[in-house]
Amino acid sequence: MGCFNSKEAGAGRPKTTTQQQQQATPEPTVTTAEVRADEKISMDQDISQGNVEDFYVVGKELGRGAFSVVREGTRKTTSDKVALKYIEKKFVKKKHIEQLRREIDIMKKVKHENVLSLKEIFESDSHLTLVMELVTGGELFYKIVERGSFTEKGARNVVRQVCAGVEYLHSQGIAHRDLKPENLLCNGEGEDMTIKIADFGLSKIFGTGEALETSCGTPDYVAPEVLTGGSYDNAVDMWSIGVITYILLCGFPPFYASSQNLLFEKILTADYDFPEPEWTHVSEHAKAFIRNLIVKDPDQRHTAKQCLDDLWLSGSDQSIGSAADLHSHFAEKMKKYNDQRRGGQSSNN
């Protein structure tokens, strides 16, 4: 996370992004400098007084990460359900404190129906606990795997909500910088499920006209201007939305290669197509929507507002393709790659 290397990525087609992503995204460098027991990660004015257990009944474990565990919680006074993310401070390296603080600052700032909300924070000598909105439907990635297909109508519903959330984030001066199905959480089932944008670990608050320069994100979804090492802006999020839309509609990514270097070459030239028969039943409106996002020049990319006004998202059902099973024959391959990433991850992790 935060940089790219030259490890080999998976070969072949069609393929989910998971195998490439796991091989291409290095783990953060571990240092010996840890957070002291008396060192605060969050700002004092942000911390709720008392212990989290004084206010919440702690329930079952929902998932586990590298240095965190997520449990279901119930507010004692209201019976409201929440997700309690316990971060064990001794595993948080000093070099990552600012990143964690930035993530908390952003989550405190945002309030939108398509963005995961942070309710309050508790901090003890051993743990930082984030009280978050509970999302029970899991990652969008798993929906793709489990269902094996999205109708164009279902894909459109997902993309519309992602664009609405991103438009809000951009209006608040926030670039997410790591949009992917794993960071899109689902509430409910079927074509009317609600989408929540999550994981702001790589997000950045920027001023009007300010350019960003840090190379970060997940290789399969990263925009060309990030790979070149130059400056970029929030248009990188729109490229990622284009890639996500492409995957939803056919079951495999627009860019695939036998190595990460070859993958980057394809991304840098925006070298992709809409192969048959996978795209036979997908409407031209959907393809045009993608072409306006997966475009090399960021200045030519549609903004989130333009996407919401696009005929594919704003039009009637007549503007979309048939409700045919778009990619059920890719389900088996996706399940295989998904097995590699099952490690107790949580929908709120």
UniProtKB/Swiss-Prot annotation:
It catalyses: L-seryl-[myosin light chain] + ATP = O-phospho-L-seryl-[myosin light chain] + ADP + H(+); L-threonyl-[myosin light chain] + ATP = O-phospho-L-threonyl-[myosin light chain] + ADP + H(+). Transmembrane segments: none annotated. CDD domains: STKc_CAMK. GO terms for molecular function: ATP binding; myosin light chain kinase activity; protein serine/threonine kinase activity. InterPro entries: Kinase-like_dom_sf (IPR011009), Prot_kinase_dom (IPR000719), Protein_kinase_ATP_BS (IPR017441), Ser/Thr_kinase_AS (IPR008271). It holds the Pfam family Pkinase. Its EC number is 2.7.11.18. The active site is at D178. SUPFAM superfamilies: Protein kinase-like (PK-like) (SSF56112). ATP binds at L62, G63, R64, G65, A66, F67, S68, V69, V70, K85. Keywords: ATP-binding, Kinase, Nucleotide-binding, Serine/threonine-protein kinase, Transferase. One of its GO terms (cellular component) is cytoplasm. Residues 56-313 form the Protein kinase domain. Does not have a calmodulin-binding domain. PROSITE patterns: PROTEIN_KINASE_ATP, PROTEIN_KINASE_DOM, PROTEIN_KINASE_ST. Residues 1-33 are annotated as: Disordered. It is an enzyme of class 2 (transferase). One of its GO terms (biological process) is signal transduction. Residues 16-33 have a biased composition (Low complexity). Belongs to the protein kinase superfamily. CAMK Ser/Thr protein kinase family. CaMK subfamily. May phosphorylate a specific serine in the N-terminus of a myosin light chain. This is Probable myosin light chain kinase DDB_G0275057. It comes from Dictyostelium discoideum (Social amoeba). The lineage of its organism: Eukaryota, Amoebozoa, Evosea, Eumycetozoa, Dictyostelia.
